[in-house]
Amino acid sequence: MLNGNHSSSFISFLRRTSTYLILLVILVWFALLSPEFLTVGNLLTIALQTSLVALVAIGMTLTIITGGIDLSVGSVAALSGALAAGLATRGGLGTYPGLLIGLLTGLGMGFLNGAMIVWGRIPPFVATLASMAIARGLTLVYTQGRPIAGLDKTFTFWGGQGALGIPVPVWVLIVVAFLAYFLLKHTPLGLHIYAVGGGEETTRLAGVNVGLVKFSVYLISGLCAALSGLILTARLWSAQPNIGVGLELDAIAAAVLGGTSLAGGVGGIPGTLAGAFIIGVLSNGLNLLEMPSYNQQVVKGMVFILAVMLDYFIKQRQAKPKGNPAD
Amino acid sequence: MTEIAIPRLKLEHIYKSFPGVQAVSDVSLNVYGHQILALVGENGAGKSTLMNIVNGVVPLDSGKIYLDGQLVSIPSPRRALELGITMIHQELALIPELTVGQNIFLGREPRRWGIGVDWKRLYAQAQRELDRLGIEVSAQATIADLSIAQRQLVEIAKALSYNARLIALDEPTSSLTSRETDTLFRLVRSLREEGVALIYISHRLEEVFELADRIAVMRDGHLVAVGNASEFTPAEVVRLMVGRELAEFFPKVPAKRGEPVLKAVNLKAGREVRGVSLELHRGEIVGLAGLVGSGRTNVARLLFGADRLEGGEIWFEGRQVHLRSPQDAIRLGIGLVPEDRKAQGLFAGQSVRYNAGAGLIQRLSRWGFIRFQAVNRIVRELVERLRVRTPHLNQKVRNLSGGNQQKVIIARWLGLNPRVLILDEPTRGVDVGAKAEIHALMSELAAQGMAILMISSELPEILGVSDRILVMREGRIVAELSREEATQDRIMQAATGQL
Amino acid sequence: MKRSIIYLLLAFVLVLAACTPAAQTATQAPQQGGEITLGLVISTLNNPFFVTLRDGAQKAADAAGVKLIVVDAQDDSAKMTAGIEDLINKKVSALLINPTDSDAVVPAIQKANEAGIPVFTVDRGSNGGTVVSHIASDNVAGGKMAAEFLCKAIGGKGNVVELQGIAGTSAARDRGQGFNEYMSASCKDAKIVAQQTADFNRDKGLKVFENILQAQPEIAGVFAHNDEMILGAIQAAEAAGRTGIVFVGFDAIDDAVQAVKDGKLAATVAQQPALMGQMAVETAVKYLKGEKVDASIPVPLNLVTKDTVK
């Protein structure tokens, strides 16, 4: 291995940047093939469309880093949107109390998840699967399966155009992403989130309140889901009881594409954002390329697998010199 | 030790029982500063429980704990840390994804502006701690990138950063090379100089006698002996531990060497294996010695088809074979008892029956259905023959002691009647009694005509059990010694290249 | 290992390359000025009705020599909005939208309005924004069609029952209106003895009709606003052993067509999704060529009876 150092530093470069490289390749590809793709308007559209998944994916990333998962996000988004819209309009509370209750709903569902997982010791997959059904059911009960329309301008503002020509949801995403990044990288809670995912017992023995850490991530995930649901409601000018179906899968995909390990302990916000944008850019670009929708799903699935495999191979290669533990 | 000091830790009449077991019974023990106390005993003797009590992991039923003469209660690991009591576990308590510095300061990160972590200060402090102890590791390195030995040292740095006054080390050398062990011992001795009280738990009696000032022996939850190290001999300690005289440490039935079964010619794979040739005969036990990292495990994995061969040939009973996967090896009758039994050898959450029977299932299935009765019968026979101590076959394997776990893995292979059995560190973390039983079993199997290749880092074991000894260094076999000509010195010289 | 990374990269590029053929036509089309590209955003392509609608639209587009881009919203309002936005950025000549929801689609339609792209709604309407035309089945005509058939089948006289859909829905309103207008104007000897709602639901249809059967010893014919309700009613009649009733449904769902074949159901009114798609495209093309089009384009319906069923 004469060129050992050379190639391993290249590989380690790939490892750190693989998600971004994949995003870049896709961007360049679409830019070459579609004249409409690389316009300011279209890029803003992509950012707008991606912000919904990205918001949820940020919360999801935190739960996955602790070694958990939150399947309830899509349903929580729908429930928060429906309650906020319903209380703001038919409930007569007005926009801001409505929005506040929407956010509290997200926190409440996050609390339910946290309680089931920390106190009830139910595995996160099962607990959040249950709350996914509960939140969707509550949404349908509250809306009677029908959309709630009639939102006023203060509400729909949150889905519309914002300062500097950038849509409000994108601003919200920027703020939330920054806060989450700061939380993960610069606060004790952030370090403890990684620690719990890397070794729960070890973390407990180091004197960290592991239950509190887990509670926090599910609360944050619930809050992110609620934000996404409120923004989607504002964007559609109405609360739709069936929004967010499958949102959890997009969010998990974004996190995994971004290098978050489902085994816990590894991941980060920049990667997740890149992952969410890979998904968003693919949807937009394939529409611009006029690919029939059935084929689009196949392509998305294949790109997903390839991206994850590429990531896996790069990481495995990097880990190889240390891979054989003792001898 | 001439002056009468207040013990750093004083235990008085400690009792602890778990459902069905009196784990610790009436233990009174003093541990002094400036001293290393070796705590020895078979697995299940109560050492771990005692240490867990001192570390606040499990509550005690009754008894008193004094620290520097003060009565204390230790309800949580957190409290133990605050009191300056730390424990370095056999399973390292480091989070592989985090950096050295993050691990050292986990749970007590220096803050900035009240909410943020002050990374600069954290890494500076961590590095200072590492440097002070002469540990050559960067505080910013990720644990996953470190060797086991480096991790062990980081663990000690972490313990000391709590201003530890009492450090318990549980089998710290079980996965270290001898050079790394030396580094560790140096560190342990310098801690003693600084006045720290140390409790050293180990199965390796050589280490105990090399290091300890005092020795405490536990058996069945009781403290059966305690005194200055000079008052004991190794044989006495063993007798105290097992409660009976062990006639022979490594009983070896002389066996007739039969025809060759497995032959390797110039095996190559990466940097770890650079041309290894060896031959195993029926009825013999071949010891494969060498430092950790010399390529021993890699050779074992190549012979088992677990890794890809980059060069060389493997012959089995006179035919050249191509082992593309472990299935190929198993089909021929080659078995491997891996070194890392928790990760590679056991289904820890499954029953004894499942673990011992796992290899049989394919063979004992008819039309896709498992013939459970046949599996049960064979498993029961094996468990009896190997004297696996388990209350019943449905016991989860993770609840067995290390020695019994190892026996379960061997039982799984015996069910397949292998012609060649490769054992990688078969007695690591196994207590003395079980160790002798495993050795006896190996020699019995060899006498029945099996060819056995045993990898071990313990020279007495290699010397006691092997008919023939191969020594590896840097991917090559550098010496072949017969049982008669082998000594610890000759093996070490070959392994370290001072030949 | 290095080789496998290269293979993976290669596969990655191939997958992306799979998108190119469509792209080449895409890059040419908008540049040849005067070419028309229509965007069809459809609520779902998991339902045969809408798949047929798309096929009809595609055929009409091919016949007219215009390009049609189809986006599937997968019954998700967010995906629908995103699809519309994408097609706005794509600068299609006109948008044909089959909304998932009449409210949720409004902001997206307004965006199209701002971009100056004419919008046509198909099947389901929008509650806001500027829409050039709404192309949908003519439910009033369908109701009339059912009434005409029923009247003839019962010989112009006798007791008639109407099972209504969910109150307030446009389908229930229009179908009922057409039915009642015809009955009162052209079938004066028949008497509507019961009008009750069964919420478009088979179960409710059964229960409601059981009660009606109790109250009405003589029933000549029944019309329901959809097939689910009429199938429920048929079950109720069979259970009660009542025969000689003429049943007429609406929608021509598979079960109902089977019932027509079996002779249990006299007729059901079928929507014509292919025709709807075709008319949507034709309307948009006409409009883009400068012709005037109506704000509401009714799509004719079709009566499925024992004689016409395949």
Predicted feature residues:
Chain A
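Cytosolic-side transmembrane-helix boundaries in multi-pass membrane proteins
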Residues: 1-28, 32, 205-212, 286-327
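Short loop segments and helix-boundary regions at transmembrane helix junctions
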Residues: 7-11, 69, 88-90, 94, ...
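Transmembrane alpha-helical segments in multi-pass inner-membrane proteins
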Residues: 225, 235-301
